[in-house]
Amino acid sequence: MAWNTNLRWRLPLTCLLLQVAMVILFGVFVRYDFDADAHWWTERKHKNLSEVENEFYYRYPSFQDVHVMVFVGFGFLMTFLQRYGFSAVGFNFLLAAFGIQWALLMQGWFHFLEGRYIVVGVENLINADFCVASVCVAFGAVLGKVSPIQLLIMTFFQVTLFAVNEFILLNLLKVKDAGGSMTIHTFYAYFELTVTRILYRRNLEQSKERQSSAYQSDLFAMIGTLFLWMYWPSFNSAISYHGDSQHRAAINTYCSLAACVLTSVAVSSALHKKGKLDMVHIQNATLAGGVAVGTTAEMMLMPYGALIIGFICGIISTLGFVYLTPFLESRLHIQDTCGINNLHGIPGIIGGIVGAVTAASASLEVYGKEGLVHSFDFQDFKRDWTARTQGKFQIYGLLVTLAMALMGGIIVGLILRLPFWGQPSDENCFEDAVYWEMPEGNSTVYIPEDPTFKPSGPSVPSVPMVSPLPMASSVPLVP
């Protein structure tokens, strides 16, 4: 089918309306929190506080790292498609910029409402980045198959559902999930896989050539992987309690990521008949350990336990890219462009299960009395809880997350199927030239034009595409 991809009026109006709405809502609801307010100086003198006791100095280094992950790490990780680099980085930038504003509001209404105002400080910025990181994860499943308007609409609903699910897990079920294995990775992976199933494209084979990578595009994607890998310890520890919990979260993530690299490389080589490595596995499966250790990051997992998690996830994630992704596409019609099920979905579920087991097995011998109370917040509402009770509620949290993801994905997928969002035709997926002004000599694909907003009859055959980037297979080998 041919679609009208001319967004001259629709995209500007959508962006401007959303931003005007954000300005109005921020004006009505949002104010600085105490540590960011000018009145802090008065309180500082009254309580004899030091400047370094401001929350900013504790949290901002972690915020910087998470911010880099969202805009550089996830953005460049998706540049592996040979003709979709502009869109991968540019659309990631767009949806993240909108998402952090909407996340500050949605999370503020659930968690940071004081009277009639949402108070915003550096911890809010970290939580908003967490929310947007999950949106970037979800973007990977529909990469190359949706319009920027669809991405903005999807971000609006995703952030809303994320805030609701996060509130249920953290506030009602009292789940521990410092690194977001459940609230971030599991939720958005299966939310977006459900959306992808509903947006199934029967003739996507027509764009199969552009769905592959090139030597340069894989190199750019590897830059994204390295940024994510380096900063993931900050991601998993960013909102943990100061002191031992935050320290432990960084160590556990560090160990899990390291083990994951070795097993990913081992399995990738073992599955190739000549023992060669697949760059897709190295770009993605090497990060699965950081995803899976998220829930248990601040628990007394022990370094060897973190290594075991990374070891297992490196194997499972790589096997998923080789066997599970093709199965999902051919049998279940789930067209997962980036393989987010293997990097985020399955490792997220593993993380949720390991978190439940680790919580249920917590003991006074391992944590100490004060440490157990502090680590699991066994006070007030939870003062009569045992470690087994905590483990049971961790499982409830995982089940609620999966249910929310599936139901939300169905609803949002049906909305995105409407024909007036400017989505590309099947023969023009994974192509920057559909939505971007390309440098001279690079735009060689024919883009069908349809003056209506509805699908037309049989699609116009496209002119054969000439890629400006050499395919990996066509790069001459140096003897």
UniProtKB/Swiss-Prot annotation:
Residues the record marks as carrying a glycan: N48
GO biological process, one term: intracellular monoatomic ion homeostasis
Reaction equations catalysed: NH4(+)(in) = NH4(+)(out); methylamine(out) = methylamine(in); CO2(out) = CO2(in)
GO cellular component, one term: plasma membrane
Keywords: Ammonia transport, Cell membrane, Glycoprotein, Membrane, Transmembrane, Transmembrane helix, Transport
PTM entry text: N-glycosylated.
A single MF term (Gene Ontology): ankyrin binding
Extracellular side: 31-60, 107-123, 170-177, 240-250, 303, 367-394
Topology of this chain in the membrane: Multi-pass membrane protein
Subcellular location: Apical cell membrane
TM ranges: 10-30, 61-81, 86-106, 124-144, 149-169, 178-200, 219-239, 251-271, 282-302, 304-324, 346-366, 395-415
Keyword Membrane listed: yes
Subunit structure: Homotrimer.
Family under the similarity heading: Belongs to the ammonium transporter (TC 2.A.49) family. Rh subfamily.
Physiological role: Ammonium transporter involved in the maintenance of acid-base homeostasis. Transports ammonium and its related derivative methylammonium across the plasma membrane of epithelial cells likely contributing to renal transepithelial ammonia transport and ammonia metabolism. Postulated to primarily mediate an electroneutral bidirectional transport of NH3 ammonia species according to a mechanism that implies interaction of an NH4(+) ion with acidic residues of the pore entry followed by dissociation of NH4(+) into NH3 and H(+).
Matches recorded under PANTHER family: AMMONIUM TRANSPORTER, AMMONIUM TRANSPORTER RH TYPE C
Protein name: Ammonium transporter Rh type C
Source organism (scientific name): Macaca mulatta
Higher taxonomy: Eukaryota, Metazoa, Chordata, Craniata, Vertebrata
